Amino acid sequence: MGIQGGSVLFGLLLALAVFCHSGHSLQCYNCPNPTTNCKTAINCSSGFDTCLIARAGLQVYNQCWKFANCNFNDISTLLKESELQYFCCKEDLCNEQLENGGTSLSEKTVLLLVTPLLAAAWCLHP
């Protein structure tokens, strides 16, 4: 196979890698009825690209969600809760509740929060 044939093969493989996916869907804990210890994991349906954990007082909701709808208005409307805290994440089973009642933050999320602060501190340092 010459250089041209190798380039065509490489292009074809690259196109397949970009346009085909393995079929892996996001896994989230899913307990749409409030519970304090959700352990039911499901594969999210197509179009649901985010895991959600929402807390309204003692009520805790875990489910698959759409990232585009990860905002207070959409979540509070669907759950019919006027005051709540929520967290959306995009890794498998990332919407698990911690023992102390908090939500687990992934290492990447923490890094995304801390990095700009460190950069700002570095720039402001005389």
From Swiss-Prot:
Per UniProt, the keywords (alphabetical) are:
Cell membrane, Disulfide bond, Glycoprotein, GPI-anchor, Lipoprotein, Membrane, Secreted, Signal
> Which SMART domains does the UniProt entry name for this protein?
LU
Renumbered to this chain, the positions carrying a covalent lipid of the kind GPI-anchor amidated asparagine are N100
Q: Could you tell me which residue ranges the UPAR/Ly6 domain spans?
A: 26-106
Concerning PTM, the database record says: N- and O-glycosylated.
UniProt GO molecular function: complement binding
Q: Which cysteines are joined by disulfide bonds?
A: C28-C51, C31-C38, C44-C64, C70-C88, C89-C94
Q: Which residues are glycosylated?
A: N43
- Gene Ontology CC annotations of this record: plasma membrane; side of membrane
Q: What's the chief localization of this chain?
A: membrane
Which residues are part of the propeptide segment? 101-126
Key word Lipoprotein present in the record? Answer: yes
Which Pfam families does the record cross-reference, listed alphabetically? CD59
Q: Name one GO biological process term.
A: negative regulation of activation of membrane attack complex
| Domain of life from the UniProt record | Eukaryota
Q: How does it assemble?
A: Interacts with T-cell surface antigen CD2.
* General function of this protein: Potent inhibitor of the complement membrane attack complex (MAC) action, which protects self-cells from damage during complement activation. Acts by binding to the beta-haipins of C8 (C8A and C8B) components of the assembling MAC, forming an intermolecular beta-sheet that prevents incorporation of the multiple copies of C9 required for complete formation of the osmolytic pore.
What protein name does the entry list? CD59 glycoprotein
Encoded by which gene? Answer: CD59
